């Protein structure tokens, strides 16, 4: 009986030691999965823009309970306010199937939401929450801006758990995504 209690105590101690690292392992695997889905969605958006012969917009959002992004098209008009389709923004916080509700001329293609409880977030790396894929070139498109300076040449998106466990997906001007990460072991991508 004493031997059994010693074995149970040893197993309990080993479980307490292994549980935190197992939780960390699960979070990193979830991060890898979310980033893989993000890259796939960006490639899908690029090909959809070309196949639909229409800009395909990508818009990001966040609140306390989630981060999200939505892919959508907008019927471009000749009115000055919507010449490039840039004044209509679907809201991924509304949820899949409802992100473009009430947005004139907008058609939702895909919406992804990540609950804050999952510990993984997806958000733009810098200011700005949207861009489009051009249907002619397959490259990225930014609507004209009145701000001074050269136009952006890429759009970077972070998929992260924390500052030490982050993937950065960069959509280059050509529309192709590339992925790098921080120096954390186990991420398996080049260091940014």
Predicted regions and their residues:
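N-terminal single-pass transmembrane signal-anchor helix
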Residues: 1-27, 41
């Amino acid at each position: 009986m004493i031997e059994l209690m010693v074995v149970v105590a040893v197993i309990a101690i080993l479980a307490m030691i292994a549980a935190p690292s197992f939780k960390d392992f699960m979070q990193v695997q979830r991060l890898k999965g979310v980033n893989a889905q993000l890259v796939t969605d960006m490639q899908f958006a690029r090909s959809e823009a070309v196949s639909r012969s229409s800009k395909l917009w990508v818009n990001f959002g966040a609140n306390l309970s989630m981060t999200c992004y939505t892919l959508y098209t907008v019927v471009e008009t000749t009115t000055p306010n919507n010449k490039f389709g840039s004044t209509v923004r679907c809201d991924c916080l509304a949820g899949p199937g409802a992100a473009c509700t009430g947005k004139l001329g907008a058609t939702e293609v895909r919406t992804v939401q990540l609950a804050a409880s999952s510990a993984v977030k997806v958000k733009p790396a810098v200011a700005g929450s949207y861009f489009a894929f051009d249907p002619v070139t397959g490259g990225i498109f930014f609507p004209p801006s009145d701000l001074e300076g050269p136009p952006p040449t890429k759009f970077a998106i972070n998929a992260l758990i924390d500052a030490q466990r982050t993937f950065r997906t960069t959509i280059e001007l050509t529309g192709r995504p590339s992925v790098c990460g921080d120096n954390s072991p186990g991420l398996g991508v080049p260091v940014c």
